[in-house]
């Protein structure tokens, strides 16, 4: 992350810098990845001025140009891996859940999506030695499924697993939850999450995990019928790219849970499909399909990844949290 102040950019004086900060653009990286219309609207400046500021920020932050594959490889060394707490699951994911990427968990009710999200919210706060990223968590809760009691159980489970004393209250203090009441509010909360992440970063508690549980609940309820599909997908596309940008800006994992639908015309194979269409499919970096099995067992299938082969892992959802079966 660049240490260059906003005021050092050509065309940005103290007054403009203040407007940008008020609009949530606290770093030159945040400015560099914005669109001119977005910057002009939120910071109340002209669109041509916004375009010049963005170009200057891209040059200063070294964003937007071509680079060779070896440099991309070098930069990817900054990508962190968050443990799931299960050996088989971690191996399937190439070491864990990646930062700077969106991981989608989809499956029918009771398949364990929220349980995985809760477990990751605990694991991310552990140090790197124990597979964590030593960071805070932001949760956008659309279905009122966050349960602090479950976090307490999982922290106690980790205490037993590693033979160390962990305080559940400290873990809960590092989890920041917001309830989203409609799709507009949900999108707005991503902007609020950027502001909160900047504040926490200054306090030495960087946000390393953003969870949206669930991604499509409000969109599915508000946009009914084929006539509203185009509007829904356009809005959803903006939301998904906002989440992706959050992951890039803060080197954080972004995990979204998703609902499913049955495809009645599927005569062979599993008729279960995630909702959200191609927008979610193309924007999510990793897609995981969760299925119920006997008792506590859950089967997690890696359906899509840019670098990993398809695979399956069997885990158990116990009182102590997510464990190897």
UniProtKB/Swiss-Prot annotation:
SUPFAM superfamilies: P-loop containing nucleoside triphosphate hydrolases, Rad51 N-terminal domain-like
Gene Ontology annotations of biological process type: DNA recombination; DNA repair
Coiled coil: none
Pfam families per UniProt: HHH_5, Rad51
Gene3D superfamilies linked to this entry: 5' to 3' exonuclease, C-terminal subdomain, P-loop containing nucleotide triphosphate hydrolases
Molecular function, one GO term: ATP-dependent DNA damage sensor activity
PROSITE patterns: RECA_2, RECA_3
Homology family: Belongs to the eukaryotic RecA-like protein family.
UniProt xrefs under NCBIfam families: PRK04301.1, recomb_radA
Official protein name in the record: DNA repair and recombination protein RadA
Gene name in the database record: radA
